Amino acid sequence: MALEIKVLDYGDIELESSFLVLGRDCGRTRRVPTYGFLILGGPWPLVIDTGYRHNQIMESLGMRGLQFHENMIENQLAKYGVRMGDVRYVLHTHLHIDHAGKDELFPMNTTVIINRRELEYSVSGLMHPQYPAPDIKHLIDRLHTKDALRLEDLELTGMIELFPGCYMEAA
């Protein structure tokens, strides 16, 4: 089975440069792309990261979201003939604002897989703006729905086979 990886373009974010690297290029604006990935060729499609919720949530952090109609996750998936309900797993590299904002658009029978410690950190209140309450609250709802959220632990679980030929580690 040949797997294909497709880049999903979720739009850009304009932000003050020192947000990326503390103290570097203070006052200078940078434009940063926001990407996710779609894995095709297996028994079902997989999505890695879901982008940010909407432009307004970026504005609440003093950033400018540049997400347009074509950047919406459902439209990015449609380019490859995939609907939200076709996706079996959503995997997250981490839960920052620009990576986990669209999980709630997937049905509850799509399993979101995240690192257990990342979920703990996201609900701790540390770095609050990077973990917006609506994004994290939805994950807690998934935690209380059978098979809607799967927690992995990098120190304990190691490599996980999602289907033959497709492996992941809890980031």
Residue ranges and their predicted role:
Residues 20-22, 61-63, 105-108, 127-129:
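Short, glycine/charged-enriched secondary-structure capping and boundary segments
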Residues 52, 97, 118:
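Short, glycine/acidic-enriched loop or turn micro-motifs at the edges of active sites
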Residues 12-75, 79:
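Conserved beta-strand hairpin/beta-sheet module of binuclear metal-dependent hydrolase folds
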